[in-house]
C-alpha cells in the first residue's frame, strides 16, 4: 500500500508513484532561494524498508564542497538532514540542519553554524544565543553559541521558518565575503568523526533499514570524511 499524505496542510509530493508528506517543503524552498547556485551532484541511495523511504543526495556550489542531504519518511514521520561543507582555506563553519518530524506532536528543529575545528568558539553577532537544554549538542565543540533548537508540533514548523532564513542568509553572506576555493577534505576529519559518535538517529535508522545499511549511510555518506572506529 502506498504512503499517503498524512495531513494536506503539510503539503505533499510524489515519489515512486505515491504521495507522501512533505513537512519540510518550505525549508527546502528557502535553501534553494538563498543558495540558488547549488547544483545537483549525485544520488547516493534510494531505499525502502518496512514502509519507510530514504533518499540521499549531494549538491555542489562554487564555494561549497558539498551539501549532502538525506530525507526519511513514512506515514507518520518526515525527517530532513543536511550539512553544508564549505570549500576550505577561509576557516568557515559548516551549516547544519536537523529537521525531525517523528509524529504530529513530536517535532525537533535544529540548525546551526558547525565549525570543523574541535573546541572552536564560534558565534554570529545579531543572532540569538541558545540557553536551553542542549542534550546531544556540546556548545563550543563543533556547535556555536547560536545553535537554534525548537520543539513543536507538525502544524507549527513554519513558525520557525523566518529564523531559518535569517541564519541561512548569514551563512550565505559568509560564503560571499570569503569566497573559499580549497578542497582539502582532511579539514573535516575530526568534525565527521565527532558527528558519527553523536548521531542521534542511528538507532532509528537501524530499526528501519538494518545495521549494515545504517552503518553504510553513516560512514559512507553522512560523515564520509571521518575515521571509522575499530
Where in this protein do the model-derived segments appear?
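N-terminal amphipathic/basic-hydrophobic helices that include classical n-h-c signal peptides
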Residues: 1-19
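Short Lys/Arg-enriched alpha/beta "domain-start" segment
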Residues: 17-95
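Histidine (H) residue identity feature
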Residues: 8, 13, 61-63, 115, ...
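Alpha-helix boundary/N-cap detector
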Residues: 18, 22, 155-162, 166, ...
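Extended, non-transmembrane interaction/recognition domains
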Residues: 81-180, 184-186, 193
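Surface-exposed polar/charged interaction patches
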Residues: 37, 41, 170, 174-181, ...
Amino acid at each position: 500500500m502506498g504512503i499517503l499524505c498524512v495531513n494536506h496542510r503539510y503539503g505533499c509530493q510524489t515519489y515512486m508513484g505515491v504521495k507522501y508528506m512533505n513537512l519540510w517543503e518550505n525549508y527546502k524552498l528557502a535553501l534553494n532561494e538563498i543558495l540558488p547556485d547549488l547544483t545537483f551532484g549525485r544520488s547516493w541511495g534510494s531505499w525502502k524498508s518496512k514502509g519507510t523511504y530514504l533518499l540521499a543526495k549531494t549538491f555542489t556550489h562554487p564555494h561549497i564542497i558539498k551539501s549532502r542531504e538525506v530525507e526519511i519518511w513514512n506515514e507518520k514521520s518526515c525527517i530532513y538532514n543536511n550539512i553544508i561543507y564549505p570549500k576550505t582555506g577561509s576557516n568557515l563553519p559548516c551549516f547544519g540542519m536537523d529537521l525531525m518530524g517523528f509524529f504530529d506532536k513530536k517535532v525537533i528543529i535544529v540548525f546551526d553554524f558547525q565549525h570543523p575545528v574541535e573546541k572552536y568558539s564560534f558565534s554570529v553577532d545579531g543572532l540569538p544565543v541558545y540557553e536551553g537544554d542542549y542534550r546531544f549538542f556540546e556548545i563550543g565543540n563543533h556547535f556555536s553559541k547560536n545553535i537554534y533548537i525548537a520543539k513543536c508540533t507538525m502544524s507549527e514548523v513554519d513558525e520557525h521558518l523566518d529564523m531559518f532564513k535569517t541564519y541561512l542568509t548569514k551563512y550565505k553572506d559568509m560564503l560571499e565575503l570569503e569566497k573559499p576555493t580549497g578542497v582539502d577534505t582532511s579539514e573535516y576529519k575530526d568534525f565527521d568523526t565527532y558527528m558519527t559518535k553523536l548521531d542521534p538517529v542511528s538507532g532509528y535508522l537501524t530499526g528501519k533499514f538494518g545495521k549494515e545499511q545504517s552503518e553504510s549511510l553513516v560512514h559512507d555518506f553522512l560523515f564520509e570524511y571521518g575515521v571509522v572506529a575499530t
